[in-house]
């Protein structure tokens, strides 16, 4: 239940590394979304790539507080003033809403890279003028390769992502309640695993 989102996160970070014009450890990074994939992207950046110049944004303050226990980053609401225009070398958009895509393109620095991971809203408008004029790289990322998955299993087996106390386990009978909390934005845990 954790290997799949961790492999998605690792794959996204590896694609970012391939497309950035400077090392990840020297890049100013914004992670949009504090769910499992956003947090796992941050953990891969922290633990595997020595990146700590990270801001994570999410409207769910309680979830950000939970992520702050495990991730070296600054944690802010999406409307926080620290998310400035033309400010980030790398943005990992793990939400997939039109509003987060707009914020990503607005906040990316000239020559920066946006990794689009989230799939909540499959369509919407996008500022292609800025993308073109400022030579922003936009990379769509979906799933992972077999090699990424094998590397993820090794990372998880060796406990390289640290304490996984941010995962919440619930009885399968409470699945509907969990999905409602996720949908309503009140779920604290970045990842819930339902146990039959």
Description of each model-found segment:
Residues 1-78:
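Mid-domain Rossmann-like dinucleotide-binding core that forms the NAD(H)/NADP(H) cofactor-binding site
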Residues 23, 95, 107-109:
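A generic alpha-to-beta junction signature in SAM-dependent methyltransferases
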Residues 25-28, 88, 111:
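Phosphate-coordination loops involved in phosphoryl transfer and adenosine-cofactor binding
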Residues 31, 93, 116:
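Redox-cofactor binding/interface segments in oxidoreductases and associated redox assembly factors
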Residues 73-80, 169-174:
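Short acidic-hydrophobic, aromatic-tinged amphipathic segments that line or gate anion-handling sites
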Residues 82-91:
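A short acidic, Gly/Pro-enriched loop at the edge of an enzyme's catalytic core
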Residues 99-158, 195-196:
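Glycine-rich phosphate-binding loop and adjacent beta-alpha segment
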Residues 102, 146, 150-196:
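C-terminal hydrophobic helical "lid"/dimerization subdomain
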């Amino acid at each position: 239940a954790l290997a799949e989102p961790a492999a998605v996160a690792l794959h996204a970070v590896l694609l970012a590394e391939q497309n950035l014009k400077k090392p990840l450890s020297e890049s100013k990074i914004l992670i949009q979304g504090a769910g499992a994939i956003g947090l796992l992207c941050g953990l891969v950046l922290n633990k595997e790539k020595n990146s700590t110049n990270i801001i994570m944004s999410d409207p769910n303050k309680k979830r950000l507080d939970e992520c702050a226990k495990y991730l070296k980053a600054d944690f802010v609401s999406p409307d926080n003033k620290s998310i400035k225009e033309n400010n980030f070398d790398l943005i990992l958009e793990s939400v997939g809403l039109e509003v987060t895509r707009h914020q990503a393109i607005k906040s990316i620095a000239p020559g920066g890279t946006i990794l689009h991971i989230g799939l909540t809203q499959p369509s919407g408008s996008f500022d292609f003028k800025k993308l073109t004029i400022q030579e922003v790289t936009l990379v769509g990322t979906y799933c992972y390769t077999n090699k990424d998955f094998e590397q993820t299993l090794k990372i998880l087996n060796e406990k390289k992502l640290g304490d996984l106390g941010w995962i919440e386990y619930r009885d399968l009978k409470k699945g509907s309640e969990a999905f409602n909390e996720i949908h309503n934005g009140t779920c604290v845990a970045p990842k819930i695993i339902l146990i039959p």
